[in-house]
From Swiss-Prot:
GO biological process, one term: mitochondrial cytochrome c oxidase assembly
Family: Belongs to the SURF1 family.
Gene Ontology MF terms: cytochrome-c oxidase activity
Organism encoding this protein: Homo sapiens
Effect the entry attributes to changing residue 124 to E: In MC4DN1; reduced protein stability
Known outcome of mutating residue 192 to W: In CMT4K; uncertain significance
Subunit field text: Component of the MITRAC (mitochondrial translation regulation assembly intermediate of cytochrome c oxidase complex) complex, the core components of this complex being COA3/MITRAC12 and COX14. Interacts with COA3.
GO CC entries: mitochondrial inner membrane; mitochondrion; respiratory chain complex
Keywords per UniProt: Charcot-Marie-Tooth disease, Disease variant, Leigh syndrome, Membrane, Mitochondrion, Mitochondrion inner membrane, Neurodegeneration, Neuropathy, Primary mitochondrial disease, Transmembrane, Transmembrane helix
Illness the protein is tied to: Mitochondrial complex IV deficiency, nuclear type 1: An autosomal recessive disorder of the mitochondrial respiratory chain characterized by early-onset, rapidly progressive encephalopathy, neurodegeneration, and loss of motor and cognitive skills. Affected individuals show hypotonia, failure to thrive, loss of the ability to sit or walk, poor communication, poor eye contact, oculomotor abnormalities, as well as deafness, ataxia, tremor, and brisk tendon reflexes. Brain imaging shows bilateral symmetric lesions in the basal ganglia.
Function: Component of the MITRAC (mitochondrial translation regulation assembly intermediate of cytochrome c oxidase complex) complex, that regulates cytochrome c oxidase assembly.
Name the record gives this protein: Surfeit locus protein 1
Amino acid sequence: MAAVAALQLGLRAAGLGRAPASAAWRSVLRVSPRPGVAWRPSRCGSSAAEASATKAEDDSFLQWVLLLIPVTAFGLGTWQVQRRKWKLNLIAELESRVLAEPVPLPADPMELKNLEYRPVKVRGCFDHSKELYMMPRTMVDPVREAREGGLISSSTQSGAYVVTPFHCTDLGVTILVNRGFVPRKKVNPETRQKGQIEGEVDLIGMVRLTETRQPFVPENNPERNHWHYRDLEAMARITGAEPIFIDANFQSTVPGGPIGGQTRVTLRNEHLQYIVTWYGLSAATSYLWFKKFLRGTPGV
């Protein structure tokens, strides 16, 4: 105790009696502070708290961003349900048109806009001198396609559709009739004279409207008489007919002539696959989101 008292008296004598305890002990222990280094209380605890708060904010933001994936997938699945319903109604409407009883061809061309794929009946005669050729084409064979599981490309034989002006005697107008398919070696009418019908005939065919050129489809070449899609205005100018077009039915086929019934009415309906895909993705990502962010949360 005497030594401690003597030490305190010595410090006071040196003017250090009121110095902070830390400075006094550094003086006693002969520890020199590093230049520029301040002796302050540790902030390790507060820094850890700030980092934890920042991480919590980041996790919360990520949580709601990732929730958009299952929500969006569910919305797309619901949209596909509506699209499938619309497509089924459209298919049913087309089937009812195709199977309907043929009606006389309307005198007003404007009525045809609502009659595509509807059978109509006409009476008149062909003008074989102005044939047009839609090519290349493959033959539509419903019997073979049904036998082979609906394969559209079941026939690989290439050829053309023969489109011939047809003067309707009852209406007094000339229309365009797709008589049907001929193989490439029979495109020249000289090779199928037997099938060039003469005189007045009765026909039943399906109304077809004009087409717009699809991507990757070549342009029509009227100079070479090669038509890749139905441009009714251009075809009408070349032949002098009205822009009215029908596909003759199979019963119009004559020996040595084009094979009629070349109307394929097919609509892709893959919406059920899309429904399963989107709802499945929504369910899977919802489970992962729940497992990542809610599992282990108190009360969940």
